[in-house]
Amino acid sequence: MEFIPAQTYYNRRYQPRPWTQRPTIQVIRPKPRRSRPAGQLAQLISAVSRLALRTVPQKPRRTRKTKKQKQVKQEQQSTRNQKKKAPKQKQTQKKKRPGRRERMCMKIENDCIFEVKHEGKITGYACLVGDKVMKPAHVKGTIDNADLAKLAFKRSSKYDLECAQIPVHMKSDASKFTHEKPEGYYNWHHGAVQYSGGRFTIPTGAGKPGDSGRPIFDNKGRVVAIVLGGANEGTRTALSVVTWNKDIVTKITPEGSVEWSLALPVMCLLANTTFPCSQPPCAPCCYEKKPEETLRMLEDNVMQPGYYQLLDSALACSQHRQRRNARENFNVYKVTRPYLAHCPDCGEGHSCHSPIALERIRSEATDGTLKIQVSLQIGIKTDDSHDWTKLRYMDSHTPVDADRSGLFVRTSAPCTITGTMGHFILARCPKGETLTVGFVDSRRISHTCMHPFHHEPPLIGREKFHSRPQHGKELPCSTYVHTTAATTEEIEVHMPPDTPDYTLMTQQAGNVKITVDGQTVRYKCKCDGSNEGLITTDKVINNCKVDQCHTAVTNHKKWQYNSPLTPRNSEQGDRKGKIHIPFPLVNTTCRVPKARNPTITYGKNRVTLLLYPDHPTLLSYRSMGRIPDYHEEWITSKKEISITVPAEGLEVTWGNNDPYKYWPQLSTNGTAHGHPHEIILYYYELYPTTTIAVLAAASIVVASLVSLSLGMCICARRRCITPYELTPGATIPFLLGVLCCVKTAKAASYYEAATYLWNEQQPLFWLQLLIPLSAAIVACNCLKLLPCCCKTLTFLAVMSIGARTVSAYEHATVIPNTVGVPYKTLVSRPGYSPMVLEMELQSVTLEPTLFLDYITCEYKTITPSPYVKCCGTAECKAKNLPDYNCKVFTGVYPFMWGGAYCFCDAENTQLSEAHVEKSESCKTEFASAYRAHTASVSAKLRVFYQGNNITVSAYANGDHAVTVKDAKFVIGPLSSAWSPFDNKIVVYKGEVYNMDYPPFGAGRPGQFGDIQSRTPDSKDVYANTQLILQRPAAGAIHVPYSQAPSGFKYWLKEKGASLQHTAPFGCQIATNPVRAVNCAVGNIPVSIDIPDAAFTRVTDAPSVTDMSCEVASCTHSSDFGGAAVVKYTASKKGKCAVHSLTNAVTIREPNVDVEGTAQLQIAFSTALASAEFKVQICSTQVHCSATCHPPKDHIVNYPSPHTTLGVQDISTTAMSWVQKITGGVGLVVAIAALILIIVLCVSFSRH
């Protein structure tokens, strides 16, 4: 990066530059060789000692006393003498000896900074740092050095900096820079600079414009920052600086910073002569003395950058600068006046020319405040003085005062007026469909004006509340700030048109008398030829009638607002002025309520929320897996909601509270180490589908085997009894009859035999009942004695990305991309003791590369005052304005309050214009359309290495290496090139949306992008709002038009939930810059280069023998819910690494201290019901066996710290039951097969 200087410091400031022999050219330097640092230090100490030991003379004290005594006499002297004394006192106050820090900086700055001048004035400074010369980009002018002025500078608008390579012969003058900035005090030209909380601050007044480019030094004389400007924060001023953080240059810009380059005079124009805008040539050029000439001069310079300086100078009427106050903010209104304009509804259902006509209603503030523009002026009296309690309105041709207390605003109910100034009113109103403004004049007559206006206070946050709470949460919002100071917002004003007034004419016999009443009147009569002119005294028109004349009052001493409800001055044309308006829209924070915490009940893979909303509150939740499955619902009354918690986790947001996160535990009601029904219940609650499938398959297999056994027995029986059935008179042997259950002719039924035994021989009856029980006991004993008939069935494949063992110090491993879960890896190297590395992701940031296409916001339609051409035809001129429309309408006959505006009936034309501009709210309320490209991934990793926990940050690209002590770590790239951002995204107020927006220059009316601009402050604007001018209504002066509604406001209503709530994998979306944080997707490979010195040889490590492991308790799928006791004997005292060689078991302790014969307790975490794992301590391994029980908590608020298994394992108890059941069924099948084989063999032998 070009803005990072290299360290080419030769210590010239503290010791002489090393001497080098020049071959031929001898360079003679005019500067004397500086002394060594020790000499400088001695001089400084001696100077400080002399200052400390010097006695303070008493004479100045007497002088001060005499001055105080003379002040009483000076008060009695003339004002002329006082003016002469004042400059002398100021000069004596300026003479102040620099402090120690200032002297030190001046000494260091002697070589390394150079003045930047423009037209002989110092506008800032350039500084030599490292191998670069650096100058703030906003400082205009050239460096006051012949060699540096010729350099080609590279400019960075991002850092507001220009830099170039230092000439070789000047490198010795450069200062060293550093990125080390511990909190404390630093030095600059004006004294001490405090660095705290990442900000540089100074006492207010210590810095000023012209200090831009000055360096800030540490106590070693190294540059830590370069000053660009400052922001006044009361007693302290926060500095805007460019500084360095390791290898990265950064810019610190506090809010409200002002550039500290010396302001250059801005020039204005008057009669082809330029002059400084702050010093008009007519000395003094004062509005009170020459109002018309002053307004004309301002109109000529309305597009000049120094227009407002010229306006202030014309109104101040003084060459001396005065302190600004609230009254001065109202001073600009002395050049304007209120006016009468057309109102569609004056309160009784009819239109009129109202003194409180509504011009514009602004509702961009998200806190619900309305900004209303009307035709009267508030806070100004008719004598142009300021008075908060008054307002002035136009009554006929004359402004009249009224009390401000009579002003009111109303929608569906009365509104609360929160601020007034000039033409503007701030009000907080309830929702409604119309807006009415009105006032009561001095004669107690009420004037109102009503407009259709749909008002609904916007929603801030996720709760629909009605009043601000005392306690809550601060959310960003926007409001109209209550300040009357000059802002960047402005309105256009122009000369008022001639106002027709037929009451000035009276008919006297055959003549017309015009009574001017102290006004300037323009008249035109069509009798005995053309008779027209401009008069200031009464005039009589002979041989004429009133109907043949037209009179209008003209006034060019004041401006009025450029309203579409009043005509444009026909003589002035497009001439106009501008004035600042109050109450700008600013970003702020609003306090919103926080909903009551819900009552939470945890169930198996479910969470139940009992909600108590005080007002309509939004509930939303999403899964933190691949498919977010986002849901939201407005809750208006008490309600109980049950939500399923997926294995990946659940995020629930209730109102304005912070999100709640839940993860399910593998909890069940059964146990994996109990009876068959408990085991079945255990697995059924964990994995119902798999359990049902396995049980169904096992049942089918058992049923098949039993059926097979029965079939073989039936076949053997049939083989045995068939020969006897075919032989006449054959008798079946008793034993065969018993085995084959053959019923003899004399045998009774089982019921008859049982009845007989019960009646005659009860002991035999009980013996017969014991036969099946004896058979069952015999079968069980056979199963116990039967060797294992089948091998253990494996129902799952334990998959894990656990530890890997390598035999080299170049180690590579893969860790899951899950934040907050520790991961351990074992590094084994022949001849060395094993080393355990523990790594834990603190955060993972995915930041896409963005390209800003445009910003869009709300537009405003500019409709200047229409140009009415009386008795003629007007023509449109092409103008390069966004969505510009111009139309000429013929046959108009407009009226003003004093009568018809034109003398002609049908030959009049009206030229209507309209175009679109960005609204004033675009500086705060806008959406940015970005194209997103390849994303970079950075990770913050905690590494436990050599007994220390160290946190490092690195780019996870597989190339960027970071050093942890003496080991080198290379992280990435991610296994999955996934991003939550689409190719096109929209950013609005800290929220990000995936949206396929229209490209630049292709916006459609009423949709997102109907107005487009490159930046909020740029002048290039594209607009397509379907603006169509319409014919004005007969008799009224207005500019009607049709236009599509704002696409930006429509998008705000329909935009839906942002990526903050809908992104998969639990991503947290942030802005400035746009990034996704902690997306749990994929794996991250890590390559580790460990030096030989980090390993411990086996001969140096303690030897551990006689190890035994006993698990005291174990709860699987819990946060280190297992505890094992390992007994050992160590050869010597030392430290041993502890590691689990089983993938599915994680041990919390990375290493332990061993000594002699002792025991240690280790905590482990596993997802296995029966954990069989090996623990390695130093180079010795021991086998551990654990019987784990399910956790008691169904839901927890942290992710699992162990390896998650897709399917649970089979416990040893379950396997024992499987073996028994399988062996029993197998034995039955084997016996049946044996019987069948014997029967078949006997049968075949007889034949």
UniProtKB/Swiss-Prot annotation:
Note: Belongs to the Old World alphaviruses that usually cause fever, maculopapular rash, arthralgia and myalgia. Structural polyprotein: Translated from a subgenomic RNA synthesized during togavirus replication.
Keywords, sorted A to Z: Capsid protein, Cleavage on pair of basic residues, Disulfide bond, Fusion of virus membrane with host endosomal membrane, Fusion of virus membrane with host membrane, Glycoprotein, Host cell membrane, Host cytoplasm, Host endoplasmic reticulum, Host Golgi apparatus, Host membrane, Host-virus interaction, Hydrolase, Ion channel, Ion transport, Lipoprotein, Membrane, Palmitate, Protease, Serine protease, T=4 icosahedral capsid protein, Transmembrane, Transmembrane helix, Transport, Viral attachment to host cell, Viral attachment to host entry receptor, Viral ion channel, Viral penetration into host cytoplasm, Virion, Virus entry into host cell
Glycan-carrying positions: N272, N587, N949, N1078
Domain notes: Structural polyprotein: As soon as the capsid protein has been autocleaved, an internal uncleaved signal peptide directs the remaining polyprotein to the endoplasmic reticulum.
Region (Functions as an uncleaved signal peptide for the precursor of protein E3/E2): 261-273
Region ranges (Disordered): 52-103
Region (Ribosome-binding): 86-99
Extracellular topological domain residue ranges: 325-691, 748-762, 809-1223
Species this protein is from: O'nyong-nyong virus (strain SG650) (ONNV)
Interaction with spike glycoprotein E2: annotated span: 154-159
Highest taxon in the source lineage: Viruses
Catalysed reactions listed for this entry: Autocatalytic release of the core protein from the N-terminus of the togavirus structural polyprotein by hydrolysis of a -Trp-|-Ser- bond
Annotated segments matching region Interaction with the capsid protein: 715-719
This protein's name: Structural polyprotein
GO biological process annotation, one example: fusion of virus membrane with host endosome membrane
